Structures are given as structure tokens and as C-alpha cells.
């Protein structure tokens, strides 16, 4: 079971920006994509990349008319090299990356399971506040 780190962050946005649509990837209908001027994708990082569902949706969005995207992710190890690949992917499709927000999240996968996990209590209130500031700048 995932630790829901990223979901906790995203749901905190809804408290401040109640007009924002937050849709779980499995419930998103790609045919509605053009109803939006900007789209954000949020995921935990699993072995160095977004979840497969988010990757699949991103590839569909890259083939749509949507130009403006932003990303939110949590990771046990913090910032990942994945961002460079992600930005390159967007640039190749003439998309604009409005920003990428990341913070550490509780991680008890792989070797971290042996020590009871790392980053207990993350994301925390400070991370939530930083996300709201990030979002305000792109909203």
C-alpha cells in the first residue's frame, strides 16, 4: 500500500483553492482535457519515476492541445534527476512547464523498510504551506 504522501499534499490544495478540480488518474476522462487551460500531474516517485498510470496519462496529454502543465511529487530521497527528463519531454512536444513542486515523503519501501522507513511525518505542514505558495504563483 502506498503511503499517500502526494495525495495528502494535493488534497490540502483543495482547502485553499476549492474551485480546482482534483481527479484521481483512474477517474480522469482524457476526452475532457480541453476543458482545462492548465493541467497538473501529481505522483509519488517509484524507483526514480512517476507511477505508471501518471506516465501513461502524461503521454496522452502530450498528444493533446494542452500547453501548460505543472507537476507535484513526493519522494523518499528528495529531488530526483527525473525532472530533467520530464522537462525535455515537454519541450519536445512544445509544452510549457509552469513549475515542479517536490518535497520528501515518508518512504518505507525497499531497504528503508528494514529501518522502519525514512522521513517520518513528511510531508508536513511546512511542505503544505510551500505547496500553496508554489500553486499561487502558477494559478
What are these regions (language model features)?
Residues 5-23, 35-139:
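FMN-binding flavodoxin-like domain, especially the glycine-rich phosphate-binding loop
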Residues 31-33:
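Short conserved loop adjoining the S-adenosyl-L-methionine
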Residues 25-29:
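Conserved SAM/SAH-binding loop
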Amino acid at each position: 500500500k502506498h503511503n499517500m504522501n502526494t495525495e495528502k499534499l494535493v488534497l490540502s490544495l483543495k482547502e485553499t483553492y476549492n474551485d480546482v478540480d482534483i481527479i484521481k488518474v483512474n477517474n480522469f476522462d482524457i476526452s475532457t482535457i480541453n476543458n482545462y487551460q492548465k493541467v497538473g500531474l501529481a505522483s509519488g516517485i517509484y524507483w526514480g519515476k512517476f507511477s505508471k498510470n501518471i506516465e501513461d496519462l502524461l503521454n496522452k496529454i502530450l498528444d493533446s492541445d494542452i500547453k501548460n502543465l505543472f507537476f507535484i511529487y513526493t519522494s523518499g530521497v528528495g529531488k530526483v534527476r527525473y525532472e530533467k527528463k520530464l522537462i525535455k519531454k515537454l519541450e519536445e512536444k512544445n509544452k510549457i512547464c509552469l513549475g515542479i513542486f517536490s518535497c520528501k515523503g515518508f518512504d518505507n519501501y525497499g531497504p528503508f523498510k528494514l529501518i522502519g522507513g525514512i522521513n517520518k511525518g513528511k510531508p508536513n505542514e511546512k511542505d503544505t504551506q510551500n505547496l500553496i505558495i508554489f500553486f499561487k504563483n502558477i494559478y
